Every structure is written in structure tokens, then in C-alpha cells.
Amino acid sequence: RVSVELEGNLLSDRFGKYASEADRLEGFPVRSFPIHIEEVPEGSVSLALAFIDFDAIPVGGFCWIHWLACDFDPSTTLIPEDASRTGAIACTQGANSNWSPMAHGSLNPA
């Protein structure tokens, strides 16, 4: 089971378009939110995540990939805030939509 803390059924502003400049790269928000993990099936070898935004299709014309990551230890119970940038927890990260020239022309993986 995976859960994230919400404020009024939404992620905190610091993780989205209202993020501070310190949490932006090339104008885009890049701070990942904390993810709580429970009840991982016994015998699991690793964990993976895909944070994909289907609501972006009408705006950008394609599904926005915010974060892809794998090889989390199956005993992980918390992926801490900003782990995508800080490397606070061991994992292998994939390319997100910031790498796509269809997004905004940047090749920075954020």
C-alpha cells in the first residue's frame, strides 16, 4: 500500500506549480513529495514507482512522466521528500518528460 500526505485532497503547493524558486529548475517544480509504503508482499525483491500525469494530456498533448524509479529495497517504508534530487534513498531513476523536446525543449532530467 502506498500513501502520500495531502492538503484538502491535493499535494502541498511546494510540490507543484506554486513551488518556491529553490524547488524549481528552469522554471519547473522538481521537489518530489514523500511516499509512505506499507504491506509490501513477502518475497518482493525490489520496489518501483511510476508517477504519471494523465491530466496533462489536454494541456501538453501527451501524458507527463514526472518520475520513474526502481530498485528500491523492499524493506523501504518511506521515500523521503526531495529524494528524486538528493539521492536520499538508493534507487535507479529513469527519464522523465523534462527530457523530451516535446515538453519545453530542455534536456535536463530535473
Model-flagged regions — what are they?
Residues 1-110:
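N-terminus-centered regions that define maturation/targeting leaders and the start
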